UniProtKB/Swiss-Prot annotation:
Pfam families, per the entry: UPF0193 (PF05250)
Organism of derivation: Drosophila melanogaster (Fruit fly)
Entry protein name: UPF0193 protein EVG1 homolog
Region described as Disordered: 86-110
Family assignment from sequence similarity: Belongs to the UPF0193 (EVG1) family.
Length: 250
């Protein structure tokens, strides 16, 4: 089996314009190289199914220029600017602003109260503002042109497949790629703890809006304070590693 892991059935089932073809050498001899079949979809990126990938949008030139001008005038980091520019080029939604990182140098109990105050005082749009922004207006969907096979060609291909003409060899089994183990770093653990803190602060704000905040407030405060202490321990561990220090435990 070839290293490209394409059998005859998969290559023959592709449309005519996507078939792998050989290019003759300059001296007119045997074909030199074999081109791989192109990705058959223009809307769905390689490496995933359409159900898990949102449809791409085409930003107008005026919208893209306005967003780039606002980014240029604002005080954003280079990482956020690159993310916004990549979203404009790929037609993806703009990245959401991240909540402020808690100050682990302060007392965990005081920092917990500050986090809950920020979540409680966050401004939210009411129904009238959401309707005025046009969020509930439905736009007419026009499916884009694709490169699928024509009806007669697809029928004939289905007939050949059902007749068993292009069935694959059962002795040939595709190779499975070995799973790559992802190493979890201290920064990943800190980001996960920050997400848990923000989720609990927002949930407590919703409970307070329904009049149930007093019932869950002590428990949520303890959970947020405990996660802040874990973040402090992870940050001190990262600082010790960066300084080249080691700690021995009996």
């Amino acid at each position: 089996m070839s290293r490209h892991r394409f059998n005859n059935v998969q290559i023959k089932a592709l449309p005519g314009g996507l078939m792998a073809h050989h290019e003759p050498d300059a001296d007119g001899g045997q074909p030199g190289s074999q081109k791989l079949p192109m990705w058959p979809s223009e809307r769905i990126p390689p490496g995933g199914a359409g159900a898990f990938h949102s449809a791409k949008v085409q930003y107008s030139k005026e919208t893209a220029d306005l967003i780039r001008l606002l980014v240029k005038e604002s005080k954003m980091s280079m990482l956020v600017r690159k993310q916004i520019d990549e979203s404009l080029r790929n037609g993806e939604p703009l990245p959401l602003p991240e909540p402020p990182r808690p100050n682990t140098n302060n007392d965990p109990d005081k920092e917990t109260l500050a986090i809950l105050d920020r979540a409680r005082n966050a401004k939210r749009k009411n129904l009238r503002q959401i309707e005025a922004s046009g969020a509930y207006k439905q736009s007419y969907y026009r499916p884009p042109a694709d490169n699928r096979m024509h009806g007669e060609k697809a029928k004939s291909q289905l007939q050949f497949t059902m007749a068993g003409t292009h069935l694959p060899d059962p002795a040939i089994k595709p190779r499975r790629r070995p799973r790559e183990e992802q190493l979890v770093t201290e920064e990943d653990l800190i980001n996960e703890l920050l997400d848990q803190i923000n989720e609990r602060a927002e949930w407590l704000t919703e409970m307070e809006s329904m009049g149930q905040g007093k019932k869950y407030r002590p428990e949520i405060r303890d959970q947020i304070a405990e996660r802040l202490r874990r973040i402090q321990a992870l940050e001190s561990k990262m600082k010790m590693k960066s300084n080249g220090g080691f700690r021995f435990v009996d």
